[in-house]
A protein has these predicted regions:
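Amphipathic protein-protein interaction modules
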Residues: 63-119
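Long, contiguous N-terminal structural blocks used for assembly/anchoring
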Residues: 5-82
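Acidic, proline/glycine-rich low-complexity IDRs
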Residues: 5-27, 32, 36-38, 91, ...
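General structural signal for secondary-structure boundaries
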Residues: 54-55, 59, 85-89, 125-131
């Protein structure tokens, strides 16, 4: 560090120290489920091992989620209509509950939706919700 700004140097060293303790990540290890997780904007992000771009990717997904929710609902609509008989997009969006995103698998899962208590709703996605695949409602 340059001696011209000793206060700044201490600040930077403090940040580096903090990052070392948390392994430089916002992810927290969940022993019960044996994975790492973090939450941004009410969205849970999980992974088995932390890759260097996961935090940035999680932030981008969290920022895009609200905007992409209507497209997610449209994509899930046929399965939801068949399983639960619900066709109103607003009702579906409000019923999905807290999303969980698996960064390793590229899946978006709803474990806490209010359409019933037996099934989980899951789908795969690419990029920042740019394409959707393989939706399923599992019981």
């Amino acid at each position: 560090c340059m001696a011209e700004e000793p206060g700044k140097c201490r600040y930077i060293m403090g940040i580096l120290e903090k990052n070392k303790k948390s392994k430089g990540t916002a992810f927290v290890y969940d022993e019960n489920n044996d994975y790492y997780k973090m939450e941004i904007n009410g969205i849970e992000f999980v992974c088995d091992s932390i890759h260097s771009d996961y935090e940035k990717h999680a932030v981008e997904l969290a920022q895009a989620y609200e905007k992409r929710l209507p497209d997610i609902v449209d994509y899930l609509m046929p399965d939801i209509k068949e399983m639960f008989g619900i066709t109103n997009p607003d009702v579906i969006a409000n019923s999905l509950g807290k999303p969980s995103i698996d960064l390793d698998r590229g899946t978006l899962t709803y474990l806490e939706h209010t359409m019933d208590s037996l099934h989980i709703i899951e789908m795969e996605f690419d990029g920042i919700f740019t394409a959707f695949y393989n939706s399923c409602i599992d019981g």
